[in-house]
Amino acid sequence: MAKKRVGIIFGGKSAEHEVSLQSAKNIVEAIDKDRFDVTLIGIDKQGQWHINEASNFLLNADNPALIELNKSNQGVALIPGKEDRQLVGTANQSVLDQLDVVFPIVHGTLGEDGSLQGMFRLANLPFVGSNVLGSAVSMDKDIAKRLLQGAGLHVASGLTFTRAAKETIDFESIADQLGLPLFIKPANQGSSVGVNKATTEAEFTAAIEEAFSYDHKVLIEAAIKGREIECAVLGNDYPKASTCGEILPQDGFYSYDAKYIDEDGAKLAIPADLPEDVNRRIQDIAIQAYKTLNCEGLARVDVFLTETGEVIINEVNTLPGFTKISMYPKLWEASGVSYQDLITTLIELAIERHERDKQLKSSVFDRN
């Protein structure tokens, strides 16, 4: 059987650029090379696309704090629509081999907010992960919370402010309404980028400024006392949930550094020490959230489990990390799915959806 040609796209103009590089490194190492030929396409911090070689596509690859994309002199142009000419190398105008599927591992803005997904659809490229709608609504924490609440699921109490309403933000009135401490976060970021905990007005003011430096919309949420539980979901029309895992932060909350820089920043309990009925209930809620937000392919659903047994959804991440300490692949490994098999399944799901969508009519006129 001929190998499938997989384009792994990584990097990007995002605060999560370095996380994406780590994820790409692990996927390249783990992918089944007997079944797939890989083309590496790195996006630098200026948004330029590069065709990279697997042997040297990263600098400082083993240092999460210093990891960099090794830029090439071979750029990429995309030709929408035609299945036999999708990507062109700009250095010598050579046509790259047609890709059978794309595996985007571009975290954060412009990567998992529907932007990249829309481009893949225009280019007629099958791709791993949620479609435009699922990606966009899941990325925007404000919109996601509204949809989840509408579906009867529990989310954290909070307020949303746009930049236009920034001057109306008042620490004392918000603290009276939501209590202390408060969590301040950009609406459209992941990996805890720009997220801060505030117990004083000075901390609050600094956190608001930082959050607005990442987005034009900011969430202010009440702190939730409970265990941080995560569940991985996999599938298109009939998604399945992994066993649950627990995050045990060592510095108060699961910050960016704890996730990706400081290997001692948090402990992971996989599987989580939960009664089986609670594990199943969280799995059911994770699948319900996944369907509510129109997710496909994969997502990680993060929840809080309170002392009273209430399950509160924190966020749904449609392109979770694939670093060596990331929860998503670890949860599936604990559920009996190896890292390599997980990558294979995700690629197969992408192709399956693309073939399904090709059956839809694109015209009201039935012409041969």
Curated annotation (Swiss-Prot):
Residue numbers binding Mg(2+) 1: D302, E315
Residues forming coiled coils: none
Record-linked SUPFAM superfamilies: Glutathione synthetase ATP-binding domain-like (SSF56059), PreATP-grasp domain (SSF52440)
UniProt keyword terms in alphabetical order: ATP-binding, Cell shape, Cell wall biogenesis/degradation, Cytoplasm, Ligase, Magnesium, Manganese, Metal-binding, Nucleotide-binding, Peptidoglycan synthesis
Cofactor binding note of this UniProt entry: Binds 2 magnesium or manganese ions per subunit.
Reaction catalysed by this enzyme: 2 D-alanine + ATP = D-alanyl-D-alanine + ADP + phosphate + H(+)
Cofactor(s) demanded: Mg(2+); Mn(2+)
GO molecular function: ATP binding; D-alanine-D-alanine ligase activity; metal ion binding
Gene Ontology CC, one term: cytosol
Record's subcellular location: Cytoplasm
Gene Ontology annotations of biological process type: cell wall organization; peptidoglycan biosynthetic process; regulation of cell shape
Domain ATP-grasp: 145-348
Principal place of residence: cytoplasm
Pathway as given in its UniProt record: Cell wall biogenesis; peptidoglycan biosynthesis
InterPro entries with a match to the protein in the record: ATP-grasp (IPR011761), ATP_grasp_subdomain_1 (IPR013815), D-Ala_lig_Van_CS (IPR000291), D_ala_D_ala (IPR005905), Dala_Dala_lig_C (IPR011095), Dala_Dala_lig_N (IPR011127), PreATP-grasp_dom_sf (IPR016185)
Amino-acid positions noted as binding Mg(2+) 2 in the UniProt annotation, renumbered to this chain: E315, N317
EC number: 6.3.2.4
Family the entry assigns: Belongs to the D-alanine--D-alanine ligase family.
Function, in words: Cell wall formation.
PANTHER family: D-ALANINE--D-ALANINE LIGASE, D-ALANINE--D-ALANINE LIGASE A
Name of this protein: D-alanine--D-alanine ligase
Encoding gene per record: ddl
